[in-house]
Amino acid sequence: MSSLKEQLAQVAASNATVALDRKRRQKLHSASLIYNPKTAATQDYDFIFDNATSALEELVEIDVRFKVFSRSLFSASSVNIDRNTQTKEQVRTLDQAVNAYLMLASAWWHLTPTLHATEWLVRRFQIHVHNAEMLLLSTLNYYQSPVFKRILNIVKLPPLFSSLANFAKAESVPSNLTIVKLFNDMDFLTLYTSYVGKVVKQKVTYTNQLLFNSCAFINLVAFNSNSEEKLERLVPILLEVCAKLLASPSDDCQMAAHTVLVVLVTALPLKKQILLAATETILANLADSASTKRCAFVTVCKLFQTLKGHGNVDQLPANIYTLFDSKISNDCLIDFLSKKETPADKFVTSYVRSIARYDHGKLNSIVSILKQVKLEKFEVRLIITDLIHLSELLEDKSQLIQLFEFFISIDEDMVLRCLHSLNLTGELFEIRLTTSLFSAERIEPVNGEDVVKGLEASKVAGLAGGAQPFTEFLNKNSAYICTKNISLLVEDDEQASKLLSLFVESVGKKYQPGLFLSSFFTTLESRITFLLRIIVSPGAPVALRLISVSNLSKLIHTIGNDTNVFTLVPVLIVALTDISKNVRAAVKKVLHQISKRPFTKRYFLNDKIYGEGQSVPMLNPKESESWLKTFLDGYLVENYDISQLLIPKKNEKMYLLFWANQALYMPLPQPKLVLMRFLARHESFSSTYSQLWENFLSSYLEQRPQWELKCSKNKTNFCEFESVLVLLLSKKEKNPAAIEFLLGALKSPFEQLASIMAKRLIEIYPTLKQPVQCQIVQDIIESTASADLSYDSIETLQSLALSADVVVSVIKQNMINVDETSNIIKKRRRRSSASNKAALQKEEVSRIAEIHLRKLTILLEALDKIKVQGSEALLTSLFDILADLDTLDNDGGLPVLYAQETLASCMLHTIDSLRATGATPKLRSVRTDILVAAIRASSSPQVQNKLLLVISALALLNPELVLHSIMPIFTFMGAHSLRQDDEFSTMVVEKTVKTVVPALLESGSSSMTDEIEFLLMSFSTAFSHVPKHRRVRLFTTLIKTLQPSSSIAPFLFLLSQQFSAKVENFEIAESKSILEFSRSFMSKFAVLDQLTGIAGLFELVKLLSEPDLKDKTSPRTLLSNGILNYTPSEMFNYKRNTFDFMDKILAEDNQGGNKGENNLKLKLLSALLDPQTEEQVKSDVKDQFAKVLQHNLVFINNVEELCSTQDLTEQGKSDGDESGSEPDNDNPVADMTEILFSLLGHILDLLPISTFVESILPLLGKDTEDIIRKHLTLVIGTKFESEPNSSATYANMTASSLLAIVTDEAEAPGVVQAALNTTSTLVSKFGDRLDASTLTECLKIGVQKLNSSSTDIVVSALAVLTNTVHVLGVKSIGFYAKIVPRALAIFDSVQDTKSDLRKEVQLSVVLLFAAMMKRIPSFLQSNLKDVMRAIFFADEVQNSISLYVISLLVQQLDLKEVLKTLYRIWTTDISKTGNSVAVSLFLTTLESTVEAIDKKSATSQSPTFFKLLLAMFEYRSVSTFDNNTISRIEASVHQIANIYVLKLNDKIFRPLFALTVRWAFDGESVSNLQITKVERLTAFFKFFNKLQESLKSIITSYFTYLLEPTNALLNDFHSGAVSDTNLRRLTLTALTASFKYDRDEYWKSTARFELLAESLVNQLANIEDSIGKYLVKAIAALASNNAGVDEHSKLLHRALVEHMKASCATSQKLWAVKATKLIYAKVGEHWLVLLPQLVPVIAELLEDDDEEVEQEVRTGLVKVVETVLGEPFDRYLT
């Protein structure tokens, strides 16, 4: 019986959708999957139904199974169905229909129609309440999609889904971990697996759902992987759901089950019975698709891999084996295993053992299965043991031969161990299987008789073979009895194999061998040859071979002595190679037996032994007797190699011929193989003997299939047979038939033979004659080019030891331009002809051309790989090939790029090998024009690069050969190769330059200079196309190869033209790139080369200035690029840009690009100062530097002439010059001069300081032009800036010279200014390292120049004084009186002017004072006010500098004096100015001073500070700034005041505060009579409010000083005498803060309270609406402060009630209500006693005519009172 709780839950669930009130019904109806509740609440069922039916129709089109619901859930009658009025049966039917719909719809929740259709079920049938479980289960796999969020938002979550409750209204979606924890609940898992079973049964599963199920179950297993107990609880549930999935015909369902099973058994290995049951279930309903079968097989394998312990690889149960065999075919099994997707050894072992037990017909397939999997040793042992047992039962034991051969090949020892464990030996088992299995060293019986005696029928025949009379055996096999007098050596292999097996069987049944032989072979000849065949048969067991030897001996005794049995010896000699020592010993005995017989002329079976009518040439009896005795004397049984004994040295040729015939006529493959091996390995075997084999070799390719079959049936290794066969092709082979066999074998379709022959060819090729070699190579090339061969002909060809002569011969056979190559004098390249093109367009000719190209390619690849020693003929032939390729490319359009590249490699190697030999060939027939043409015509950069390397190599081998092609080569390189951005192309260009250019230089040609300049032009033209990161290395290589001394200048000249063009076209990035390159480029050369190049560039620019230039220099190549055609303006721009280019090259790169060890300046210093540098080098460097300097000065002196081309501008215009006819600068002379002086400075800067000073000081004399002296002076400053302090001596010398210039009254102002600036730099740089007299002189001259009429000179003088004062400090005090007043006067003189130098003057004066502050601060106090005024009013100086000077002032000077000075300067200057910068700096200084001043000083200066403070409070009345600016200033002042007050104690601060109050209220100490009382009060209350925020309760008692004045002020506000809203707000804020921060019951004093309370409340009468809230807060704060004093509360309450009467104004009542509401909200409990007096007032206010008042009371005051009371207020009103 269910519990009461459960009964109540059922009742609640059934009534979940019963709504008894309107709100409940509306809430139920507004639950929607699509619409928000407000929209859903307005919709009727008809609208929802129409949408749903339309959506259902769309779903029906997708899945027709939805149609059934159109007659139930979506029928027209469903609109009127109310599940609350249905019977239980009807409700159950309805739930079943809903559940069926949800299971079907589960697959389509990602579609909009599903939402709209399900919306009907939610709205009409409330499935989110009654079918919530199924709704959630069917959509759970959408847990991270928006649709699931919608469902969670409306569904009533069942208890099992409670973990999803947190996501119902949240923004986030359930995580993967949430789902795992949900499934970890066993009750939920049971529920979900039940649902899975239902969907599988209903056949409504789909891929995403199954994927979710699999992932959920897998994650669940992983989540509990550490808890074996939990996993064991999961096993039955998961196995049940897997069984349901496997029962489905769906591929997806089965795959899902496979996945889950694999993970489950991996986490928790299961019992074998469970795994077998699972396997049976997997196989029972296995789908036919290949993917499902593969998945099932992998699963089964993984299941079996988890088995542990004894019996884990037992045979499969019969029903499972049968089931597996019916579902998965053998081919599928092998295919699955070959993919090796999973370990399968355990299953395969069980499966193979099952085959051995149940299905003997499939034994033949076991090997193919085992080859695909690697088994453990114990698994192999079990299978072998099973098969050995099976051999006892199996009638046809031949099925096991292949199996045991496989096992023996992988582990022979294990097979023998298994046999021994079953009391079997290897030889007996061989007899049982009627074949040879084991190697002889493993099984060694004593002799044949012992074997026969030891045989037991049961061990040989097995349990299947019982005792059988011989007659019965004979009758059964009578068909195989041989009655003819024939040789069994040539008998059909099938017949012989059967007789062999019968012989083995008879021996195994213990029949006497003689009985078998006499019964089955009626003639002696057939018996003997049968035994011979067994003795040399690899398929016969060793024991049987021993028995055969024994019986052969007996039969020989029966042959008469008149018969010579030497015919048997060759076969017995083969038997001596048997791997069994016992067999060899037995055979030796037989040979001894034969040697003792008479050697007559009648040979036994001489014409029949190798075939009927085959008469084999034999040795004469005497020779045969002698040979056999000699052989037996030398033979030892232990000796396996008998080749030396076989063919003795004496009569070697005769014996070689004899054995060659024996090998030729031998019909059996194994003996033939042995004899051929003996022959081929003999040192005397040659092509002479191979002639015997002509017929055999000629027919072998046709008969090869028969030989392969024969080897297979006789168990002879066919690969070994053919390997020995090809050995018949001897070294130095010349037999045409043998060569034809070789070529035929290579072209044959037999891969094995072709590969073996290829290896043999590689071995014998070097010994062949050249014609044969050529024939073979040509044949290989032709066959490779025309057909697909079965061996790697390319590798074979590349492995041959080709010689240059062979290659040349083959090349000649493969040429198409033979007529042209024969004429070696021709130097013109062959031109393409229309006839050639037309011919090559024909299909047949085109095909031949393609084959020809393939031939050339094959040959070139081989040549490239082999690296043949080069010769002139070979190199000539290679150039002929290049011509052929040119023809095929141009005329035939064939792809020759690869061939050309390979050819280039061959050429390179050939040339290198010629150079290595030291040969100097004339190479007259080598046509470099073809090479150059190929380079130009090729579209491949790789080919071009390779061919350029060929040219480089040729230049090294024979320089004259390439000289006439230099120009085309470098033209091409400039247009193509330089543009390639790869390391190889760069290397090629560099190598070409390094090899070809020296050839040009060494040639001594008269036109060499022109060619070099042409080369430079070619390369420089391509400059912009060369990748940036490769330029420096490339062009450095070029110039170094061309000799830097003569080529840097032309190259820079060409580069400067490009730079100028980029600048004129505003291509800034490109011009910078050229500059960066030039700096790096120049740094790669020695200092002398750099200076020579710069001087040369000056000379070339000078050359352009000569008159009649065009006519004069027209022959020069360097000027042939159009520069002579420049218009005058273009020429001017070029020169200007070139000088700028030079200047920037020499300038130090600020970013460090030119400051490394390769810097020209450093190199110059090293050359001049390094003691190891030779004097000649120093002299040369100085000479070149002098040239550079001289050129620069010449251009400066002739700058007017240099710019005179501007006069021709108009002429240029008239001649049609439309491009850039005007220079960029309006003053070209000044522009050019500036650049030249900058260049001069950088040139001089290169010198070491000592040389620099010696060189430059003489130039400062009067004889030098002023402008040059000015620039030189500036250069001095720049030079010394980068010098170390150790150069102070030179600086002192320079400073003295400069001061001498300054003192000269006749000097030009510009020179004087420059001298002062440079002197300032020197003083700043070297400081006290300069002589004291020099520094004193600086002060004197600086003071003197302060009186100059030139402001520029004054500024420079101030700079000198600043730096000198900074250095001398107190020592400069003697000049203080002369400096400061004059500096202040200078400052004042520019303040009211618009001078261009106003900023510079202000900055100079400020910096002078800063220096004095640092060095002589105490002396500066006498002029502190003026100094500070100068700082404040220096509005042109940057803020950062001013702030720095102010920080110095605060740090260095006495702060008391500073504070006094600030007060004075405020009153006299700052308060009267409109300069915002001055005010800002003043406030900054004041703040810094206040922050830095100590408390003692602050106390002593407090009167001064407060005077300043009051003066600043009055600033508002006199300032011209806007209100916002003044407010910001006041805010800063308040902040500063707060900081200062914190440094004072109460004793000091109180009187000052009282003074401030009196100033505010009474006007005491007012300095500005224009300020009004309201302004004073406003300023005061702002200050007081900030003070209260900072000090809080500390200054609450200070309110005493302003209590009565404030009360009077409040009364004035009430009466209207004062009506300033802002002041009123500030006053109320001050009162609120004071009430709020009162911690000492200051305001609980009755006197103070009564004085202020009424005045404060009276403000309600006329408070402005904008500040009413401040009044409410003040009243509430006062009430809160006095909450514990009942009398005060009553007084305040009565006052408030007075303002809420009906007679009061609306605003007055409203604010009074708000004040009362806030009071009750804060201290309601204390005011509850006053509530009775308030109730009538509230009742009256609730009936107030003003709606706003009524609403405020009803919704505000009443609600607050109810909150305090804890009960409705209505009962107080009744």
Curated annotation (Swiss-Prot):
Complex and partners: Component of the ribosomal small subunit (SSU) processome.
Protein name: U3 small nucleolar RNA-associated protein 10
InterPro entries per record: ARM-like, ARM-type_fold, BP28_C_dom, HEAT_type_2, HEAT_Utp10/HEAT1, U3snoRNP10_N, UTP10
A GO cellular component entry from the record: rDNA heterochromatin
Similarity comment: family membership: Belongs to the HEATR1/UTP10 family.
Keyword Repeat: yes
Subcellular location: Nucleus, Nucleolus
Record keywords: Nucleus, Repeat, Ribonucleoprotein, Ribosome biogenesis, rRNA processing
UniProt organism field: Eremothecium gossypii (strain ATCC 10895 / CBS 109.51 / FGSC 9923 / NRRL Y-1056) (Yeast)
Gene3D superfamilies: Leucine-rich Repeat Variant
HEAT repeats, residue ranges: 1734-1772
Function, in words: Involved in nucleolar processing of pre-18S ribosomal RNA. Involved in ribosome biosynthesis.
